[in-house]
From Swiss-Prot:
Name listed for the protein in its UniProt record: Transposon Tf2-7 polyprotein
PTM info: Processing of the polyproteins proceeds by an ordered pathway, called maturation. It involves the initial cleavage of a 27 kDa capsid protein (CA) from the N-terminus of the polyprotein, followed by the cleavage of a 56 kDa integrase (IN) from the C-terminus. This leaves a 72 kDa protease-reverse transcriptase fusion protein (PR-RT), which does not seem to be processed further.
Misc. remarks from the entry: Retrotransposons are mobile genetic entities that are able to replicate via an RNA intermediate and a reverse transcription step. In contrast to retroviruses, retrotransposons are non-infectious, lack an envelope and remain intracellular. Tf2 retrotransposons belong to the gypsy-like elements (metaviridae).
Alphabetic keyword roster: Aspartyl protease, DNA integration, DNA recombination, DNA-binding, DNA-directed DNA polymerase, Endonuclease, Hydrolase, Magnesium, Metal-binding, Multifunctional enzyme, Nuclease, Nucleotidyltransferase, Protease, RNA-binding, RNA-directed DNA polymerase, Transferase, Transposable element
Composition skew (Polar residues), residue ranges: 218-231
Stretches assigned to the Reverse transcriptase domain: 436-615
GO CC terms: nucleus
Limits of the Peptidase A2 domain: 266-342
The species this protein was found in: Schizosaccharomyces pombe (strain 972 / ATCC 24843)
GO biological process per UniProt: DNA integration; DNA recombination; proteolysis
Residues reported in the UniProt entry to bind Mg(2+) 1: D502, D566, N567
Amino acid sequence: MSYANYRYMKARAKRWRPENLDGIQTSDEHLINLFAKILSKHVPEIGKFDPNKDVESYISKLDQHFTEYPSLFPNEHTKRQYTLNHLEELEQQFAERMFSENGSLTWQELLRQTGKVQGSNKGDRLTKTFEGFRNQLDKVQFIRKLMSKANVDDFHTRLFILWMLPYSLRKLKERNYWKSEISEIYDFLEDKRTASYGKTHKRFQPQNKNLGKESLSKKNNTTNSRNLRKTNVSRIEYSSNKFLNHTRKRYEMVLQAELPDFKCSIPCLIDTGAQANIITEETVRAHKLPTRPWSKSVIYGGVYPNKINRKTIKLNISLNGISIKTEFLVVKKFSHPAAISFTTLYDNNIEISSSKHTLSQMNKVSNIVKEPELPDIYKEFKDITAETNTEKLPKPIKGLEFEVELTQENYRLPIRNYPLPPGKMQAMNDEINQGLKSGIIRESKAINACPVMFVPKKEGTLRMVVDYKPLNKYVKPNIYPLPLIEQLLAKIQGSTIFTKLDLKSAYHLIRVRKGDEHKLAFRCPRGVFEYLVMPYGISIAPAHFQYFINTILGEVKESHVVCYMDNILIHSKSESEHVKHVKDVLQKLKNANLIINQAKCEFHQSQVKFIGYHISEKGFTPCQENIDKVLQWKQPKNRKELRQFLGSVNYLRKFIPKTSQLTHPLNNLLKKDVRWKWTPTQTQAIENIKQCLVSPPVLRHFDFSKKILLETDASDVAVGAVLSQKHDDDKYYPVGYYSAKMSKAQLNYSVSDKEMLAIIKSLKHWRHYLESTIEPFKILTDHRNLIGRITNESEPENKRLARWQLFLQDFNFEINYRPGSANHIADALSRIVDETEPIPKDSEDNSINFVNQISITDDFKNQVVTEYTNDTKLLNLLNNEDKRVEENIQLKDGLLINSKDQILLPNDTQLTRTIIKKYHEEGKLIHPGIELLTNIILRRFTWKGIRKQIQEYVQNCHTCQINKSRNHKPYGPLQPIPPSERPWESLSMDFITALPESSGYNALFVVVDRFSKMAILVPCTKSITAEQTARMFDQRVIAYFGNPKEIIADNDHIFTSQTWKDFAHKYNFVMKFSLPYRPQTDGQTERTNQTVEKLLRCVCSTHPNTWVDHISLVQQSYNNAIHSATQMTPFEIVHRYSPALSPLELPSFSDKTDENSQETIQVFQTVKEHLNTNNIKMKKYFDMKIQEIEEFQPGDLVMVKRTKTGFLHKSNKLAPSFAGPFYVLQKSGPNNYELDLPDSIKHMFSSTFHVSHLEKYRHNSELNYATIDESDIGTILHILEHKNREQVLYLNVKYISNLNPSTIMSGWTTLATALQADKAIVNDYIKNNNLNI
C-alpha cells in the first residue's frame, strides 16, 4: 500500500462506524480464524517485486517476509500455498503438477523450477490468499466472530474492513451486494478503480498526442490536494468546477446525447477525469426529467460550490449510436448542460477514439455473463434445468390436461392472416420449425383457426403468439381463482431467506386433452397448425395453469411456498430449513417433469423481486422498474394514454398516499360529458404523483405474534383506516392503508353510524388478519360516543346496528378513544376516497325521507283549484280530458298530477311562495340550500320557473344570509405599497405573541425594513407599554439606522396611543396603519413573522423555553438568506458586503461601501427594480384568486363578516357568521367602504371595511320583509316605522342586541316577534298610529 493510499484509508477508517456493517455469518470457522490472525498482526507494506529480477533475489525477500510474520506462515504448507498464489496462471498449474508428483518439494524449489514469478502488491496477495473461498457470506455473524477472535485496536479493525475485506471478496458472486451496503467500501473501490485506470487499461490512452483544441484536450493535473468541504459526506474529488481524479491525466470532448424517452438531445461533456455523471437543474427543468432525493449529500466546489441532494432516475441515452442506461447527479450550475464520467464509460466498455473524436464500444469477449450455476447442494436436480433440457413434448398428467370446452360446436371464425414483414417471417419460420421438431405443434386440418402475431420479449427477441380473441368468445370460462397478491405477501411474514424459481416455457409444460387439439389451431403463411400443449393467449390458460401448479406443489404450497402462475417463491426463517424447503419443491417439480429456467432463478437471497415487488425480511416495496415506468411517463395526448397512465398508478396505489385525491383532476377528463382539454391542473397532478413515487413507503409483513392496532375514522363522504403492528423498538409500523367511498344511503347516516361503518368496513377488509386473534387487538376511534354503543349490552337501536353487533362478535378487540388531532392518519384516509371500490346501487338500508310533506287537506285542494282558474294552460288541462291524455297527466281529487307523480301548480303565486316557505323555514330540514330545497319540493310539486323562484327566495332569506358562509372567491385585487428609495426609510412593525416564557420574556418585537427586508428581533413581554416600546425602538433601530420616514403597523393600542404619537412627532416619522382585518396591507411583516417562527421551531423545538438564547442566530440566519423579492441578502444590501458564516469562509468586502458611491446607487436601483417586479408578480398571483369587485352604492345594505374581522364577534361557534345589515355611506378608497354603524359601537370599531369582508344583503319585500333574527332582539328602545306586506305587519325597530348586549341595532321584524320582545312599547305604537290589527 502506498503512503498516499495508506493515509486515505486511515482517514476513511476514522470515519467508519460499526453500524455501517451489521455483521457477517459463515460456517467456515477456518476462514474466521485466518482473518483473525491477519487482523491481529497488521502486516505493513513490503514493496512491490519486479518479476524480471532473478529468482534468488525474490526468494530471499520472501524468506525474510515469512520470518518476520511467523503467525501468518506457521508451517511449510502455508508458505508453499502463499508462493503458489503469487505465480502466473500457467506457471501455477505447472508448479501444482510438480508438487502432486513430488509432495516433498519446498516452496524455494518450486520457485526455482518454475522460473518465473509474478510480484504483486498487498491487495493482490490478499486476493490470492482468499481466492479459493466461494461460499456466500452473511455479514452479521462474520464480523461478530471476527471481532471476538481478533485482539487488535479499533483503527486496525476499520482499516482491515475497508482495505482487505473487499479484495478478499473480489471473486464472490455477491460482490455488488457488499458494495451497495458499505458506502465506505464502495467509495474506496470507485476511487481505486479510477486512479489505476490509466495504467491498467491502455485503450483509454489517446492515440494521437497532437489533438485539436476544439474537440479533445489533454490536461495535466497540477495538484494532488483534496478540497474536502465536509468530513461526514461522501467524497468526490474535484478540480476547478468538475468532479476530477487527481492521480491521472484527463481528456475531454463534447457530444450530442440523445434521450429517446423524452424526445430531446443535450450537449454532453465526455470527461475521463470526472468520477460522477452530472446534469444541471436548468436542463432537468427544460426537458422535465424525473429526479429523486439522493441520500448521500455531496459538497462539490470550485467555481460553483454547492450541495447535491438530488439525482435523476436511470435514463436511456444514446452517444454516437451507443445506447447506455445511467443516472446523473443534479447540480445548480456547470459549464455544460451535462457530463458523462469515466466510471460510466468504463462500466459500459466504451473507449475514446482520439483521432476521430468519437466513442466506440468494444466487444465484451472477456466479460460474457455465464448462466448462473445451480448451487452444489442442489446438483442432484441438475436434470430439471433448462440447460440440460431442450423443449420437448411433455407427457400428459392424468387429471391435469388442458381442456377446452366450447359454448357451441357450430361456430365459424373469420379467415384472415395478419401481414408479416420479412423479419417476422423469419422469426415465424424459426418458431414453427422448433415447434415441429420438439413436437409441441403439428400440422392441422381444422376448419377454424386463429391468426398469429408477435410480441417482443424483454431481451429484445420476438415471441410468436396466437391471437385467440375470436375463439375466446366461444370458450367456457374457468372459474378457478387466481391468488390475491395481498394474501400471498402475508404468507411471507417472518421469513429471512428466499429462493425464486421460474419455470421454462411454463404453458408448454401442460398437454392438451386428447381430442381438443383442433380447437387450438392457428393459421400463418406456412399453413395451419395446432398445439399439443397449452398455448399462450387463450383466456382460460392462466386459471388452468394456477390449478396445475397448485396441484403439483400440493401441501408444501401452504407452508413455505407461494406461487403466482409460473413464479415460485420459497421462503424460510433459517438457512438450514431453507435447504430442505428448496429440495422439497425441486423434487415435486422433478416428479412432474417440469423444467426451471436457471437464468431467472435466484437461490438463498435475503431480498428478491417477486411479482412486481421488492421483498425482504422487513417488508415489501414496488420494484424500481415499475416506479420508473410512471416517472418517465410523458404528458398523455388522449384518453387512451391517460387510462394507461392511471393503470400504472393504480398498480402502485397502496404505496401512494392520497391516491384518489391526486388522480381526481385526471379522472375528470375520462368522464363522458367532459371535453378533452389538458390544463396545468392535470400537469401538476401528474407531477405530484411522480413526487410521491420518488421514495415509496415500506409496508411491513403482517405478523400474527405482534400486537395489532387498527385506527379508523369517517368523514362526510368516506371512511379510512390504517392497520399497524408493534415491533421490537416499541414503535408501530403500517401493514396497510384503506379508504373507501360511502354509498348514497350511507351518506345519510348519523355521525355515530358513520364512525361505526368505518370500523365494520375495515374489519371486513382485513378479516383474514383480524378474525379469531388469540390476544385482543386495539381499535382507536376519535368518536367517544361510539365506545358506549359498541360495549353497551342493551337492545340495539335498529336492525342495522343489530347486524353490526352480530358481526363484531367474530372479533377479539378492545376499543379506545383518541382525539382526531392524534388520529391523523386514519382521519386523512377517510378524506381520501378509494374510487376503485364499487358502490352498490341498492343499499341494505333505506335512505331517510327528508321531505316534510305538506298535508293535502281539503283547504289545500280548494286553494290549488282556485289558483288553477287564474292560469289558462292549467285550466285548459283541468277541463279537457283529451289534452290530459295527450300530455300524460291525470286528475286526482281535483288536482293535476303528471307522470312523475308531481302536483302541477300555477307559477309564482302566493301558494308557491307558501310552499317554499314551509319547506325552507318550517320543515325538518333547517334552511336547506337552493339545490337541496329544489330537489325536495320537486318530489311533490312542480310549476313553471320553480328553480328561479326558489333561488330568489333562498338568496333573500335573512337567516341564511347572516349565518351561512360564502364559497365564492374573495373580492378585491391586491394594492401593493410602492417601495422606498433606500434602506431604513420605510419600516413595518408587529409583535409575535403566545410564545412560551423564556428568561422572563413571552413575546417578540419584529421590525422589518421594507427596502432591504432586514429584520430586527427584540424579546419583550405581552404587557409591554407604549413608552417601553418607544425606548426599545430608539435603542435598537434609530441608534443604528437613523430616523425612518414612515412606519406601517396594525391598529395595536400601543401604536395608536398618545405616547407613541409624541414619539413619532419627536423623530419626525409618519405612522400608517394597515386596514383593520386586512392582513394583506402589511403582508411583509406577516410573512417575516411566519419565517421567524419556523426558524425558532427548528432550533428549539425540543426545548421551547430556551428560544431567547437563539434569537441572535435566528436574526443572523434570516438576514443572510437571499430574499426572493430582492434577489440579495438583507445584510448585503444594508452593509454592502457578505459576512463569514462559518470558520471555513472569509467575508467578502466591497471596496465601495459609501451609500453615495456609484456602485451603491446602482445596487439600490437594482433592488428597487426587483421589488417593483416582485410586487407585480404578487399582484398577478393574488388577483388570480379573487373575483371581480362587487361595487356598492351609497344606501346599499351590506353585511360584515364576524369571524375573520373580529367585528361584533364572540368566541361562540354558534354565533351568526355576519353582522348587519348596515347602510353604505360612501366609498373611501379603491376597495374600501365606510358603513353607517350604530352610535353604540362606532367608538369600538372602525367604520371602514375592505370589500373582501362585505357581502351584499339581498332584500325582497315581496318575499320576506324581516331583516333581523328574532333571537337577537333584546329590549326594544324605539319603533321607527311600519309597513304591511301580504297582510303581515312589519316594524322597523331600534333594539339592544342579545348577542352583544352593549350594542344597539335596528332592523325590520314582524309584529308577532316585536310583541314577544316588548309588548308595552308595541301596543303604544299601535295605539298612537291608529293601526287596525
